């Protein structure tokens, strides 16, 4: 049986500079940092008889070999856990913190609530406009049905009452120009009337004298 001295490497440390607040690496087991462990190695004769001849006794694993096997398992487990912790730390640094998640969710909720409030205000304004339009239409119909017929007002002209005209020959139709009693007609009618009377009177006197003379001559 030959022994070899093997230097056990120190367990890997997680040096993650990006995550200062991440999980710290596990401390190495005590007594393994730069320690030398004696590993018993069997001679490669190929059969058990050679081992029995060389050693003379059956090989019994020593406490150091058992301790070395346990340490190897512990080192492998520690390396595996350190890898998992490093991956968790990187994912922890990459993923947002719960506070940031809550802040993002709160911002999203505030944005959605603002959108809903703006939409609700717009809907209320539109509803009020529709109600006002309906009221105006109803008022217009009521006014149109209650008012009188659409007839333009008449223009009123104030006229003074006619005065009673006094009777006079001057303003009559006969006294007007071309009438019976007009000035031109009277200027012609009166002289002709006078001459006709004079002629009739002279003719009557003459006829009377003629009749009286024969009767006187007969006596």
From Swiss-Prot:
GO terms for biological process: defense response to virus; mitochondrial outer membrane permeabilization; mitochondrial protein catabolic process; positive regulation of apoptotic process; regulation of programmed cell death. GO terms for cellular component: endoplasmic reticulum; mitochondrial outer membrane; mitochondrion; nuclear envelope; nucleus. Residues 69-80 have a biased composition (Basic and acidic residues). It is a single-pass membrane protein. Undergoes progressive proteolysis to an 11 kDa C-terminal fragment, which is blocked by the proteasome inhibitor lactacystin. It is found in: Nucleus envelope; Endoplasmic reticulum; Mitochondrion outer membrane; Membrane. Induces apoptosis. Interacts with viral and cellular anti-apoptosis proteins. Can overcome the suppressors BCL-2 and BCL-XL, although high levels of BCL-XL expression will inhibit apoptosis. Inhibits apoptosis induced by BNIP3. Involved in mitochondrial quality control via its interaction with SPATA18/MIEAP: in response to mitochondrial damage, participates in mitochondrial protein catabolic process (also named MALM) leading to the degradation of damaged proteins inside mitochondria. Belongs to the NIP3 family. PANTHER family: BCL2_ADENOVIRUS E1B 19 KDA PROTEIN-INTERACTING PROTEIN 3-LIKE (PTHR15186:SF3), RE48077P (PTHR15186). Self-associates. Interacts with BNIP3 and STEAP3. Interacts (via BH3 domain) with SPATA18 (via coiled-coil domains). Interacts with PPTC7; this interaction promotes BNIP3L degradation. This is BCL2/adenovirus E1B 19 kDa protein-interacting protein 3-like.
